[in-house]
Amino acid sequence: MKELLFATGNKSKAKRFTKGLLEHDIKVLTLEDVPINIEVEENGTTAIENALIKARAYAKETNLPVFAMDDTLYLENVPEDKQPGMYVRRVNGKRLTDEEMIEYYSNLAKEYGTNGLITGRWIYGMALISNGHEYTYTWSKENFYITSTPSKIINPWYPLNTISINIKLNKYFTEITEEDKLLIQEDESHVVDFLVNSITDSKAKKKNNF
């Protein structure tokens, strides 16, 4: 079985692609599985740039193919200077705690939303490095609401879920059940296809000395 390193320490994030890649005989490893301890300065201006920075840094430390991803958040009707972009947790140079994030974004919804609701969209950037070749991919997920009224439940790692509402179900993400997830699960097989096809392409190029 082939191994592919995901440049993240977040196991829950890795689960998004684990099953699909296993079907292609590829096992996903995270930074918890490999003896690499480096600091990476993510100073790119886009999600793709940051993903490339992370992938390049870890590719130098291992012989494994490496992929990394980053995301940006766009909020409708919010001024450009207040758009979170890549810095969802960092506001005015300060890294926010979970509680501060909930307060800050719920206040944005109150100020710029309609009836306390702002429409948001996550846009993702991914980079893979294999056999010295670089590949990039971007996609977005379905719109959702950020509300000025928080749920009473806070998710570790994902504090924005406390003030985020799935439009299809009209439920807070923190209150969505396993049954609900089956109804709203977005097909990310195209991301798995990108990873598999990129690895396959890099092997072909290596074989042909490209």
How should each PLM-predicted stretch be described?
Residues 2-5, 12-19, 23-210:
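Anionic-ligand binding patches
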